Amino acid sequence: MFVSFLVGMVVGMVVGMATRAHTDGVRLAGQAGQVRREIGNDWWIRLVCRLSHGHWRVHRERPVVRDLGSPWQDTVASERTGWRTRAAWLHGEHVFAVDYRVCRRCRIGWVESPATFEPYRRCGLATAGLIALRADHPGLTWHTLGGHFPVSQPFWESVGSGVPGGYAQGALCPHVDRG
């Protein structure tokens, strides 16, 4: 009897935490248009790469991910030189992030590696983040670099519906470095 009481309490706590995470995630998705941008785009790294015709790369240490005090943040990407990261923060931790790159000359945008922390999946964070990116960069055709995992195919079909390019796999243009 005591064991079933404990199990009931634990299950109740887990369900309560999941419900709170979902509610918080939905609320955060609704704030996707409130973005704080970190200044800095590694212009000097791109200059060195351009002057050396891509033969010499500057390797930098992985930047520290820091909270800028806004629910949604746009910062220099930590793993791809010249790319940026759009991330959602909740309770001092990032719960969603996607790397992106834009070529204004070719009117193309790429997104890579969207990731949502488990308790906040299916709250609309990824969809809201991608919509906000498109709003910040209107008139672009949107692609991804890599193929899509079979399990993520429904997600890409959903978020790509009606979007120019549809987040289909697309190579980088000559003006953009893979990072």
Locate each region found by the language model.
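Non-catalytic substrate-recognition and accessory regions of acyl/acetyltransferase enzymes
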Residues: M1-R121, I131-H143, G147-G179
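Residues forming the Rossmann-fold NAD(P)(H) cofactor-binding site
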Residues: T127
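Conserved G/P- and acidic residue-centered "switch" motifs that form tight phosphate/ATP-binding loops
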Residues: G124
